[in-house]
Design a protein with these regions (language model features):
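N-terminal cap/lid segment of alpha/beta-hydrolase-fold proteins
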Residues: 54-56, 60-63, 101, 105-149
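Short beta-strand element of the alpha/beta-hydrolase
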Residues: 150-159
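Alpha/beta-hydrolase active-site loop
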Residues: 199-221, 241
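Hydrolase active-site cap/lid region
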Residues: 241-291, 307
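Short beta-strand/loop motif that positions the catalytic acidic residue
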Residues: 305-306, 311-313
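Catalytic histidine neighborhood in serine/cysteine hydrolases
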Residues: 329-349
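Catalytic active-site module of serine/aspartate enzymes centered on a nucleophile-bearing elbow/loop
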Residues: 354-412
Length: 412
């Protein structure tokens, strides 16, 4: 172990590229996804990756103070919004620390405390759920719709840079707007699981998710036959694996594709992803991480998925080469459709590119509409089709005139 940017961990071959990441952070205000236009959410005071936790943490502290002041004078809706913002900022601040140290513990605990206020102020019931699993504890937030009979449940799987507190926002809950409950999960490699020392393996996320499903379908509020999985970004990798293993999944929506071979993310993208996964997996050598990454492949698994499935990818997502996504799509034997967002990268959007916050992305609306339709038994609009979405065309995925083709130069 060596000291790297003030943190103790194994030195990696790609660490020599850190100066390029720091330069991109200065120029873009983003810790990753440098392809996106416009400046990101990082404060301009951040000049290096190692500065992110402190400066985002200070921004979170300021937001928390505002939330407390607004709550003290009875402005409860404003307080809820600011507590949610503070919780998210604290969560982003802790994410970039790739070891369990005092700073990460402080920031993550502050995120949870702020979200406790969100739960108390929300216009519906949000339960913090703990589930015993494999000698440890898994956690999730269960957002309960105000329904009088058992309703569908959306099992939400965040990405590897997110926590369960980041989505949904209680005042813009796209699942509840469609009369569905939603459970946001901190599985292995995420949020509370990281702080508890639950390390990620190639297979334990789907095992943990199945344990959570065991509990959730026992709840009287939830219709056990209508449990759908909404898996975003790296969560889409885990969502594909869960759907291939657990027959209780009624439908799967997996946008912001991350199901391709993992060397695209770990070796072709910014080096911070390999640094992150050293922490998430707890391995001590780069060779061990490469072995785990190889074992994460979904090839040969996707054919076992039986439920209706939606995949969505940016045409030029560096972690998800389009031809490889097509190969995975063609392996599916279930009712399935694939949406390709022309000229976009990872965080695809039809109506709100560069949304300021994740919870505002129109990807949530589109995915949850698609899942609600599956719960209602509606036929798929584009079964076994690739839909090529060009925002400039003005057409969404359900328009009769939308293009159905795989490549920009084809007719369709």
């Amino acid at each position: 172990m060596v000291s790297f940017q003030g943190k103790s961990r194994t030195r990696l071959k790609r660490d020599g590229q850190q100066w390029m990441v720091d330069r991109m952070i200065q120029e873009t205000g983003r810790p990753f996804h440098f392809q996106v236009e416009g400046r990101g959410r990082l404060p301009r005071s951040v000049r290096r990756h190692v500065m992110i936790s402190k400066h985002m943490g200070r921004a979170a502290q300021r937001m928390q103070i505002i939330a407390e002041e607004e709550e003290s004078v009875g402005h409860m809706t404003t307080a809820l919004n600011r507590y949610f913002d503070a919780s998210t900022l604290y969560a982003h601040a802790q994410h970039v620390i790739f070891e369990n140290n005092a700073e990460k513990s402080y920031l993550h605990a502050a995120s949870l405390r702020c979200f406790d206020h969100v739960r108390q102020l929300a216009p519906y019931r949000i339960e913090h759920i703990n589930i015993d699993w494999s000698g440890g504890v898994l956690s999730g937030n269960l957002h309960l719709a105000n329904t009088t009979k058992p309703a569908p449940l959306v099992f939400y799987i965040p990405g590897c840079d997110q926590t369960k507190e980041m989505f949904p926002h209680p005042l813009l809950n796209q699942a509840l707007q469609r009369d569905m409950h939603i459970f946001s999960f901190d599985g292995p490699g995420q949020g509370e699981s990281n702080l508890r020392g639950i390390k990620l393996t190639p297979t334990n996320y789907e095992e943990a998710a199945s344990a959570a499903i065991d509990y959730l379908i026992s709840r009287p509020e939830i219709d056990p036959k209508l449990l759908v999985v909404y898996a975003m970004s790296f969560g889409s990798h885990w969502g594909v694996r869960i759907a291939s293993k657990d027959s209780r999944v009624h439908a799967l929506a997996a946008p912001w594709a991350s199901y391709c071979e993992k060397y695209h993310l770990l070796d072709d993208e910014a080096p911070r992803w390999k640094q992150l996964f050293m922490y998430l997996t707890g391995v001590t050598t780069e060779a061990d991480l490469d072995e785990i990454a190889d074992a994460m492949s979904v090839r040969g698994m996707v054919g076992a998925i039986a439920c209706p499935t939606l995949l969505a990818v940016g045409e030029y997502d560096p972690r998800s080469p389009l031809e490889e996504v097509y190969e995975i799509f063609d392996e599916l034997t279930c009712p399935a459709e694939l949406w390709v967002f022309a000229d976009q990268h990872h965080a695809v959007s039809l109506a709100r590119p560069n949304a300021e916050a994740n919870y505002q992305s129109d990807s949530h609306d589109m995915a949850l509409d698609w899942l609600r339709d599956r719960c209602d038994g509606k036929p798929m609009a584009n079964e076994r089709q690739v839909v090529y979405l060009e925002p400039a065309s003005g057409h969404g995925p359900y328009a009769p005139a939308v293009s159905r083709r795989r490549r920009w130069y084809e007719e369709g």
